[in-house]
Amino acid sequence: MKYKKRTSFGLLTVMIYFIYLKSTSKTGKLDPLVSESSHYRYFQKHYKKTPPVYQQKINDAGFFFEEHKILTSDGYILTAWRIPRKLSEPTFSDIKHEPIILQHGLFDSSFTWLLLDASHSLPLILAESGYDVWLTNTRGNAVSFEHENMNNFNSYDVYSKYWDFSFHEMAVYDLPANINYIKKITGFDKVSYVGHSQGGLIYNILYSINPTFIEESIKNYVSVGTVAAIFTAESKLIQLGAKFDMSWILNALKVKNFFCFNEKFYSIINNFCYYSNKICSLIVNFIVSNGKDTNRINPKKLFENFLYAPGGTSFKNISHWLQMYKNKRLAMYDYGKKKNRKIYNSDIPPEYDFSVFQNYKIKSLMYISDSDPFSNENDLKHLTDQLNRKYVTIRKMSNYNHLDFLWSEDAKNDIYKDIILFLQKNNIS
């Protein structure tokens, strides 16, 4: 019986990926004009004719827009979008806008912060309040898919070693690169940081590895949809992924990325959600809240969001997340005993040492919810038990799922205003 369930789940995965692979070339390489980041590529292709929608949205709200390319120490090229100041402000103004980073979560990109209208969008609310806003991206999503050596690390090739990364590399390479670049460009010694989901997890991991860097670089920290660990996560999606070992399927397909679909696939998802928004809502609710409808996201607008989501990631990253759930350890990537001994000199990978958080002195604000199956108070204790609560405030929200923190208009009054007050209280503006 277990074998049949595993086979059925595996066949479904194969069917989905068959559709994906059919839209690639015979070599497994994506057509550059309809790549895994098709929406972004489309806007880039037509950039000279019409400003991209995200740039237009920012400009229409009354702000300048900039795009920056950031090189990591291991050769990945990340994209960051900047909202530096109002259009009405002189270029050589003496006004200093303190920088703040907004870092997306798993399967996501910087698009996610801009899907609401300007009056409900966190980055534009922050910009209106006087901040220099940076929407950063981690490697391998729809916005950051470049490498300085594209011959050997070709993101358009679904089999490429470009995709050999997980949240560990995002924490060790991407986050420091983004922070250092923004400090250099703005001239500020410290920046503030807002992370959603994985965006908060990589912050914690970097602190566990290099606490001095974070203490010297971060002024204030905010986490929404906070995930410190997923040892007891109630997400049916995580539980299914951990229960049904998909590694044999993935190894057979030899495909290394996940949800990095091309334009055809995005079109299918978008049209499906447009004509069947109720079914689409049910699927999304299953993913982000185990089927519970919090009624915070407009289902009629949901289909629009799938022009820009999911943002994509690597299979190795997903595997690393599932290892955390199955092994009940927040540790480095588990390659198996033989390779672990070679890399770590141990049968099992070392855990990230959160005991260093006992010396954590950065003012922090964290949000969790009773309707978020990816996060709960029990798992949060893996972090908070180490923290001096003098520096940390935890907000327990009711009836917010994992995406409501980003895509619900209710978040403006329930969360974003509180974030502004927190930042102002800690002298960021």
Located regions from the model:
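Acidic catalytic loop of the alpha/beta-hydrolase fold
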Residues: 371-375
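Alpha/beta-hydrolase active-site loop
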Residues: 162-183
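Alpha/beta-hydrolase-fold enzymes
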Residues: 26-33, 184-189, 200-344
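Short beta-strand/loop motif that positions the catalytic acidic residue
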Residues: 360, 366-368
